[in-house]
From Swiss-Prot:
Localization terms from the record: Secreted
One Pfam short name: Toxin_20
Tissues expressing this chain: Expressed by the venom gland.
GO MF annotation list: toxin activity
Superkingdom of this protein's organism: Eukaryota
Similarity-based family: Belongs to the neurotoxin 12 (Hwtx-2) family. 02 (Hwtx-2) subfamily.
Function according to Swiss-Prot or TrEMBL: Postsynaptic neurotoxin.
Disulphide bridges: 52-66, 56-77, 71-82
Residues making up the propeptide: 23-48
Keyword annotations from UniProtKB, A to Z: Disulfide bond, Neurotoxin, Postsynaptic neurotoxin, Secreted, Signal, Toxin
Protein name in UniProt: U4-theraphotoxin-Hhn1p
Amino acid sequence: MKMTLIAIPTCAAVLVLHTTAAEELEAESQLMEVGMPDTELEAVDGERLFECSVSCEIEKEGNRDCKKKKCKGGWKCKFNMCVKV
């Protein structure tokens, strides 16, 4: 009897945790589905790449290295261009 009283809540807790994990996994797979690109994010990345590469070229023409401070928000200066980290 005592074993049954312990087993029922334990099984219920495991079931709830398993269901929650399955729902999270399904949500992640839908977000990462191939063929559904985030075009707005790609446009921002493209603009940032152009903007940073132009600013790096301006710095290079002045015989100075690219300012690393120009590249922010997950970007770093590499090969005289800002690239996404």
